[in-house]
Amino acid sequence: MATIPRRAYAEMFGPTIGDRLRLADTELILEVEDDLTLRAGGYGEEVKFGGGKTIRDGMGQGQRVNGPGAADAVDCVITNALIVDHWGIVKADIGLRGNRIAAIGKAGNPDIQPGVDIVIGPGTEVIAAEGLIVTAGGIDSHIHWICPQQIDEALASGVTTMLGGGTGPATGTFATTCTPGPENIARMLQAADAFPMNLGFFGKGNASRPEALRQQVDAGAIALKLHEDWGTTPAAIDCCLSVAEQTDIQVAIHTDTLNESGFVEDTVAAFKGRTIHTFHTEGAGGGHAPDIMKVVGEANVLPSSTNPTRPYTVNTLDEHLDMLMVCHHLDAGIAEDLAFAESRIRRETIAAEDILHDLGAISMMSSDSQAMGRVGEVVIRTWQTAHKMKVQRGKLPGDTDRHDNARIKRYIAKYTINPALAHGMSHEVGSIEVGKWADLVFWKPAFFGVKPSLVLKGGFIALAAMGDPNASIPTPQPVHYRPMFGSFGGALARTSLTFLSQAALADDVGTRYGLHKRLAAVRGIRSVKKADMIHNGATPVMEIDAQTYSVRADGQLLTCEPAQVLPMAQRYFLF
């Protein structure tokens, strides 16, 4: 039998079982757990495109026509991809049919090859992923819709779904993620047609009677946002959650920093055990001072972080005060405004936030775009936090001296499957699984989490790192992110989703508003609990000292040092 050295094999076909890769310049090492391309019975039946390679007529490419059946040829095949997802770290071919993932396994020509479950035919396009990591598109569930250019930045970072509220650079939007009222919701849904991004909008949830809240849900809001700047009282919380229970949408909350209408215990009591998504759960982004982080221990609370406090570094505290003053329309000349801002910034709780992420007690990551957070850094900050925790805390249960697979799965779930579950869209997006929308992000391992090579939306290339369009080949400088054909014309509307409430979809608001994008309803939200947060469902007993701000989880003091240096930073950004 012919053999090939392991390194030569990896360079030709990508890594296989037992091979290890470093993620960017972090201390995180993955190890390939399985190789689905071996379903042919072993090595030797791999497919690869190019001169002298195997995807040629009568070889790895057969004669079958494209169609909907498993025996038909797929529209596009991604060869030899290294999939990194919450469910595993595996090598596989990926077949795309229409906008969705049709199969994950072994591609080729079943007329001459064994074990083929992805058929390559004359109508099949090829994307070569040898040596590349492929992840599900990220989901950012905390967007202030302050400017549409955020979407360009987010897409270029590997985010393919953005959820939040706002109407542009309005004062209310600067501070709160709310698109208030049916008219504003309609305008934002119409604007969404222009962007190669899955979008969903939050209505304003601050009301003590349900009529105006229900009106926003009927108009298309996929969630309601409770924000202290509008008055997050126990009455408003109870009313908002009652409407959510009736309409199967999510409620996101930014609680009462000043403790004017109650303390954290009063807010938890107002939840009445109902599911809720708590934004910036550490508290620097807002929430009961100093102990909002107690909600991490509640079974019905789905906690997330925003990225300005991720991870805790020597610069974190210094940058927060000015950010906070601007975002919440505060005046540094007013003593009460300054005290309000300073009450939210606590080194002890920010340090504990790092550890709670590593324990799987904070379930999600998001940006808080242009409202103290950076829309293009959700993915980067997630992996910087994972790196810092490995360096400071060592291995997680399930990891070994060879790999950090358990930690990698925990952290990737924070911006993929868990926000999808929390917001009722995991049937469409959030992971690389058969039947789901083909939002896929391709990374060179050295650039993982920092700069993707290619972004697919709904099975079609929407963005790529592309060289000079006038060059003789695609690679000459300057290489930068450029929109591809999936970002234009009718292809855009066919390859991206707009999420609506079930009530709005049933009422056919798409026709009434004149929408062109594919529409999908959120569902199954009210039954989601903390235990459903994949790899991130821990509910420790939380204690926070009101005087010292020290944080304990299950009696253990949570503290760590700020990072002096981080990976995935200046080495990658010269300009």
Swiss-Prot record:
GO terms for molecular function: nickel cation binding; urease activity. Keywords: Cytoplasm, Hydrolase, Metal-binding, Nickel. PROSITE patterns: UREASE_1 (PS01120), UREASE_2 (PS00145), UREASE_3 (PS51368). SUPFAM superfamilies: Composite domain of metallo-dependent hydrolases (SSF51338), Metallo-dependent hydrolases (SSF51556). Disulfide bonds: none annotated. It comes from Leptothrix cholodnii (strain ATCC 51168 / LMG 8142 / SP-6). It is found in: Cytoplasm. CDD domains: Urease_alpha. The active site is at 328 (proton donor). Substrate binds at residue 227. Belongs to the metallo-dependent hydrolases superfamily. Urease alpha subunit family. This is Urease subunit alpha. Residues 137-575 form the Urease domain. The modification N6-carboxylysine is found at residue 225. Pathway: Nitrogen metabolism; urea degradation; CO(2) and NH(3) from urea (urease route): step 1/1. It comes from the Bacteria. Its EC number is 3.5.1.5. Pfam families: Amidohydro_1, Urease_alpha. Carboxylation allows a single lysine to coordinate two nickel ions. GO terms for biological process: urea catabolic process. The keyword GTP-binding does not apply. It is an enzyme of class 3 (hydrolase). Its cofactor is Ni cation. InterPro entries: Amidohydro-rel, Metal-dep_hydrolase_composite, Metal_Hydrolase, Urease_alpha_N_dom, Urease_alpha_subunit, Urease_AS, Urease_asu, Urease_asu_c. Heterotrimer of UreA (gamma), UreB (beta) and UreC (alpha) subunits. Three heterotrimers associate to form the active enzyme.
